[in-house]
Amino acid sequence: MKFLDQARIYIRSGDGGAGCLSFRHEKFIEFGGPDGGDGGRGGDVVALCVEGLNTLIDYRYQQHFKAKTGTHGMGKNRAGARGADCILKVPAGTQIFDEDGETLIADLTEIGQSVCLARGGNGGFGNAHFKTSTNQAPRRANPGQEGEEMTLWLRLKLIADAGLVGLPNAGKSTFLSTVSAARPKIADYPFTTLHPQLGVVAYGDREFVLADIPGLIEGAHEGVGLGDRFLGHVERCRVLLHLVDAGCEHAGKAYKTIRKELAAYGNGLDEKPEIVALSKIDTVDAETLKNQMARLKRAAKRTPLKLSAATHTNLTETLQSLLAAIDAAGAAQEAAAEPAATSWHPCD
C-alpha cells in the first residue's frame, strides 16, 4: 500500500431543504388554511477516526466531498428528510488544519473519535409556520439555508508504541522486518525507506506497534530530505529506539547528529525515553566493534545495546528493553493524566 501523510481537500455541507407553500384542500372545507411543511436540514461533513487505516492515500484520488441536501417540505405539514452526512474516514493520528495550514481544527488520536467540520444548512420554514391570528393564509415560505464550504489540510502523524530513528542505512528496516511481519524495502544504500512503515511486534503474550521512520540527516528539522515531515511522526511514539550503524565512520558523531535534530525540531522529541543500540555488529571486526561501542557510550552517556538483525543477535534483549520502556512511559502518561489528589478537611 502506498503511503500518504498529507492531503488537501475541499468540503461542503448540504443545503437545507426549502419550506413548502401549500394549503389544505379537502371536500366541504372551503378555507383549509396553510399546511406547508418545513424543509429538512442539510447533511454535515464529519471526520471519523477508524481502525484499519494508516495512510491518507484515499484522499489522493478524491479531494472534493459534499454532504446531501435536505429534502424540501411538503403539503399536509410533512417536513422534509434530513440530508445524509458525508463521513470522512481517517486513521488515528490525523490532524485537521484550516486552509492556511497552521490553524489546528481537530486532532483525532483515538478510534471512534469524530468532529463535525461543516454543519448542514437549516431547512426553510413552510407557510404553516407563518400563520397568525391576523394572517390566516400566509403566502410565504423560506428557502433552505446554504451549507458551509471550506478547504482543509489533513496531516497524519503515525501513532506507535516505539519508533526507530537513526541516520540512513542504519539497519532500521531490517530490524523491523525481522521482529514483525512488515516487509519494508531493504537495500544496501541510503534512503531505501522513503515513507514511514508500521509493524506489529509480538513478544511472548505481548504486542506493540513499531514505526520505522525514514533516515534523518543533518538539517532535517529545517526540511532537508523531508526531515521535518518525518520528525512529525516521531511525536506520537512513546519510546525511541536509536540505531547507530557499527560500520559508520564515528558512532558518537552519528548519535549526536540525530540528537541535535530531535532537539532542534522541538515538541519534546529529545525528551522522549530512548534506547540506544549499535546495529549491524556482524559487519565489523572485534576491534572496530570495541572502539565504536566506546565512542557511542561516551556520546550517549549510557551503555548501549549491540545487535544484528541479520543474524538475530541480541534481538530478545532489545525487545525486552523496548517493552520495559513502553510500559514505563505508559505508566508515566497515566499518572500525569490523573487529577492531583486533594486533601479534605472538615474546617475548609
UniProtKB/Swiss-Prot annotation:
Q: Where is the OBG-type G domain?
A: 160-327
Superkingdom of origin organism? Bacteria
Name the top EC class. Answer: hydrolase
Summarize where GTP binds, as residue positions: 166-173, 191-195, 212-215, 279-282, 308-310
What biological-process terms (Gene Ontology) are attached? Answer: ribosome biogenesis
Domain Obg positions: 1-159
Query: Which keywords has UniProt assigned to this entry?
Result: Cytoplasm, GTP-binding, Hydrolase, Magnesium, Metal-binding, Nucleotide-binding
Cellular component, GO annotation: cytoplasm
The cellular location(s) given in this protein's UniProt record come to: Cytoplasm
Which residues are noted in the entry as Mg(2+)-binding? S173, T193
The entry lists its GO molecular-function terms as: GTP binding; GTPase activity; magnesium ion binding
Q: Which InterPro entries match?
A: G_OBG, GTP-bd, GTP-bd_Obg/CgtA, GTP1-OBG_CS, GTP1_OBG_dom, GTP1_OBG_dom_sf, OBG_GTPase, P-loop_NTPase
Q: What Pfam families does this protein's entry cite? A: GTP1_OBG, MMR_HSR1
What cofactor is needed?
Answer: Mg(2+)
E.C. code: 3.6.5.-
Give the protein's function. Answer: An essential GTPase which binds GTP, GDP and possibly (p)ppGpp with moderate affinity, with high nucleotide exchange rates and a fairly low GTP hydrolysis rate. Plays a role in control of the cell cycle, stress response, ribosome biogenesis and in those bacteria that undergo differentiation, in morphogenesis control.
**Subunit structure comment from the entry:** Monomer.
Q: Which family does it belong to?
A: Belongs to the TRAFAC class OBG-HflX-like GTPase superfamily. OBG GTPase family.
Name it.
GTPase Obg
Q: Which organism is it from?
A: Beijerinckia indica subsp. indica (strain ATCC 9039 / DSM 1715 / NCIMB 8712)
